[in-house]
A protein has these predicted regions:
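Conserved beta-strand-loop-alpha-helix hinge in the C-terminal portion
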Residues: 213-236
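ABC ATPase NBD coupling module
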Residues: 68-83, 227
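Helix-to-loop junction immediately C-terminal to a conserved catalytic motif
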Residues: 52
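Conserved ABC transporter NBD signature motif
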Residues: 60-67, 113
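The feature captures the beta-strand-to-loop junction immediately N-terminal to the Walker
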Residues: 37-39
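Q-loop/switch helix immediately C-terminal to the Walker
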Residues: 88, 94-110
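Walker B catalytic motif
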Residues: 162-163
Length: 244
């Protein structure tokens, strides 16, 4: 189980101190699917980065199965099964998809093993294993390949930062199917930062984060009416990419 205890991040500059994440406490049980949503600038991505170790908290603790992992590096957290999917996954010119999967797995993969990871994310293995992870791939393809690397790592906790960003509707539909399938298998804990209703509706629980604090928490049926009733700068919280 992942536990956040009074997790905080305060930034300082010439204008003073800014609380980006404020005393966030949260339990995420193994196998659960949690969506963190809320207005832009509310601290969602920062919270995800704190869990992965991409940012360092100024207060509080992060526990994994009771172990305090707050001081651990990104590498050590990855070894404990935590993985992070960026809004815009990196591309690697000259690196084949098969090579990327092998690196993620930390061992030599058989052809069948590599194929299975791509098949699980809805990609035809024979069309992708030999391709470069470069600009010839669409945003949706790169994101599904990144999810395949998370599977190859045998990640117990997968964190996705706005996976819908920058992809077309067809790719988003396939991505949603992939996430649903992962959750139904029950082998992974999933945390997704998202505004998308279709993703929110799949979650076991939703956390509404605003101004760095938890402003609401519950199931989709419990929290969705609140999400619909709130607006930020005239835009519904669930508008795609915050566009009115």
């Amino acid at each position: 189980m992942l536990t956040l205890k009074n997790l905080s991040l305060t930034a300082s500059d010439a204008q003073g101190r800014t609380d980006i994440v404020k005393n966030v406490s949260l339990d995420v049980e193994d196998g659960k699917f949690l969506v963190i949503t809320g207005p832009n600038g509310g601290g969602k991505t920062t919270l995800a980065k704190l869990i992965m170790g991409l940012a360092t908290p100024t207060g509080g603790q992060i526990l994994l199965d009771g172990e305090d992992i707050t001081p651990l590096s990104i590498t050590d957290r990855a070894r404990r099964g935590i993985s992070y999917s960026f809004q815009q996954p990196p591309r690697f010119k000259g690196m084949k998809v098969s090579d990327l999967l092998t690196i993620a797995a930390g061992k030599t993969l058989s052809h069948d093993e590599a194929c299975s990871y791509l098949t699980q994310v809805g990609l035809c293995a024979r069309d992708y294993l030999g391709r470069d992870v470069d600009t010839s791939l669409s945003g949706g393809e790169v994101k599904r390949i990144e999810i395949a690397t998370l599977l190859a790592k045998n990640s117990r906790l997968m964190i996705f930062d706005e996976p819908e960003a920058g992809i077309d509707l067809w790719s988003f539909a396939r991505l949603t199917e992939t996430v649903r399938d992962l959750h139904e298998k029950g082998r992974h804990t999933i945390i997704i930062i998202s505004h998308q209703e279709r993703i929110i509706r799949l979650a076991d629980e939703i956390v509404l984060l605003a101004n760095g604090e938890i402003a609401g928490r519950g199931t989709a049926d419990e929290l969705y009416p609140k999400l619909l009733s709130q607006t930020v700068a005239g835009c519904n919280l669930l508008e795609v990419n915050g566009i009115c």
